[in-house]
């Protein structure tokens, strides 16, 4: 089953376990976020949204897009302006598509335990001794 959600002024077609990059969403890696603005679920089209439909997702990482250069030049005036912009993005993994006001499963509701320290740092410390 698929759904169409709206976030950050854009619409995304999503299905369970999809990994997508969206405009910045508040939350850290491992947090669960819910999207209530569901425009379509399967063959059900909302007017404007599907009542009682929620899409849950897990935040995988917070990041930034590639730099976009905005260059303006005024001809014959020796005048130019260069500015750069990097959009903040959030990578999310779609957990569930819920309809009819269903609650998220316990698996989606639980937060993941923090990861252990990287092994590379421990290996460097041992080789230095």
Curated annotation (Swiss-Prot):
Superkingdom of origin: Bacteria
| Pfam families, A to Z | Ribosomal_L21p
**GO BP of this protein:** translation
Q: Per the record, GO CC terms?
A: cytoplasm; ribonucleoprotein complex; ribosome
Regions annotated as coiled coil: none
Positions of region (Disordered): 100-129
> Which InterPro entries does the entry mention?
bL21-like (IPR028909), bL21-like_sf (IPR036164), Ribosomal_bL21 (IPR001787)
Q: What is its biological role?
A: This protein binds to 23S rRNA in the presence of protein L20.
PANTHER family for this protein: 50S RIBOSOMAL PROTEIN L21, LARGE RIBOSOMAL SUBUNIT PROTEIN BL21M
Annotated NCBIfam families: L21
Q: What is this protein called?
A: Large ribosomal subunit protein bL21
Species per Swiss-Prot/TrEMBL record: Brucella anthropi (strain ATCC 49188 / DSM 6882 / CCUG 24695 / JCM 21032 / LMG 3331 / NBRC 15819 / NCTC 12168 / Alc 37) (Ochrobactrum anthropi)
Lineage of the species this protein comes from = Bacteria, Pseudomonadati, Pseudomonadota, Alphaproteobacteria, Hyphomicrobiales
């Amino acid at each position: 089953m698929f759904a169409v959600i709206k976030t950050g002024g854009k619409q995304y077609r999503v299905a369970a376990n999809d990994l997508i990059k969206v405009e910045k969403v508040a939350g850290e890696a491992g947090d669960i976020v819910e999207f209530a603005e569901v425009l379509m679920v399967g063959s059900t089209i909302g007017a404007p949204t599907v009542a009682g439909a929620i899409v849950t997702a897990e935040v995988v990482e917070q990041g930034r897009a590639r730099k976009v250069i905005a260059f303006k030049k005024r001809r014959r005036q020796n005048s130019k302006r260069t500015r750069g912009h990097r959009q903040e993005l959030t990578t999310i993994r779609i957990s569930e598509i819920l309809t009819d006001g269903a609650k998220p499963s316990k698996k989606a509701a639980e937060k993941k335990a923090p990861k252990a320290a990287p092994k590379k740092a421990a290996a460097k410390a041992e080789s230095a001794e």
